[in-house]
Curated annotation (Swiss-Prot):
Belongs to the MsrQ family. GO terms for cellular component: plasma membrane. This is Protein-methionine-sulfoxide reductase heme-binding subunit MsrQ. Its cofactor is FMN; heme b. HAMAP family: MsrQ.
């Protein structure tokens, strides 16, 4: 059942500019942290801190992208035009997070990378999330939607698997359950739970619309 809340939507002629503005604003935190890392503003271990912050922002944008559908279904807040941008920004942060790990943290030394993975297996979860995200990012365009048809929706449901491995990667990397991991675990549970009950909610909404209005 949807709540009686509706926000005015932006006229379509302004949407492209709004989407590009979202890309610029969304990538600003990464650029800011890069500047801080390069100028000594991230403290004692700037590489680790930079790597961690990129991962956090990847998780934030991933969650924001997955919130678009519940907001539309339950509150009539239609941000569907921005979902692709939110997903791609999340992908860019995951890619940057992984690149910083490989290049700055491990220095592209294969032995060091392999040893680190054996010592910290949760790194494999992060790598799995990136691998799954690659085809999702590559098919986040109208041509792929037309080409793949119904298979596109099936493919992009894998984003929920990315959410699971991303949250697990984050929680295991923290090595302790504090407020921040609890927040992302809770967000994951809510998003996955809504995905499970959504068919029932949408059926109820369709039945309500089909019901004759009493005069």
């Amino acid at each position: 059942m949807a709540f009686a809340l509706s926000l005015p939507s932006l006229p379509k002629r302004y949407q492209p500019a709004a989407i590009w503005s979202l890309y610029v604003i969304g990538l600003c935190p990464g650029l800011w942290y890069f500047y801080l890392a390069a100028t000594g503003g991230l403290g004692f271990n700037p590489v680790k801190d930079f790597e961690h912050l990129l991962g956090i922002w990847a998780l934030r944008f991933l969650c924001l992208g997955l919130l678009v559908t519940p907001l539309r279904d339950l509150f009539n807040v239609n941000l569907i035009a921005y979902r692709r941008a939110l997903g791609l920004i999340a992908f860019y942060y995951v890619l940057a997070h992984f690149t910083v790990y490989l290049v700055l943290d491990r220095g592209l030394i294969l032995g060091s990378i392999a040893g680190d993975i054996l010592k910290r297996p949760y790194i494999m979860l992060g790598m799995a999330g990136l691998i799954i995200l690659i085809p999702l990012a590559l098919t986040s365009n109208r041509w792929s939607i037309r080409r793949l048809g119904s298979r596109w929706n099936t493919l992009h449901k894998l984003v929920y698997l990315v959410l699971i491995v991303g949250v697990l990667h984050f929680v295991l990397a923290r090595k302790s359950i504090t407020l921040e991991p609890v927040f992302y675990i809770s967000t994951m549970v809510v998003l996955l739970g809504y995905r499970l009950v959504r068919p029932s909610i949408m059926t109820m909404k369709r039945n309500k619309r089909a019901r004759p209005v009493r005069t």
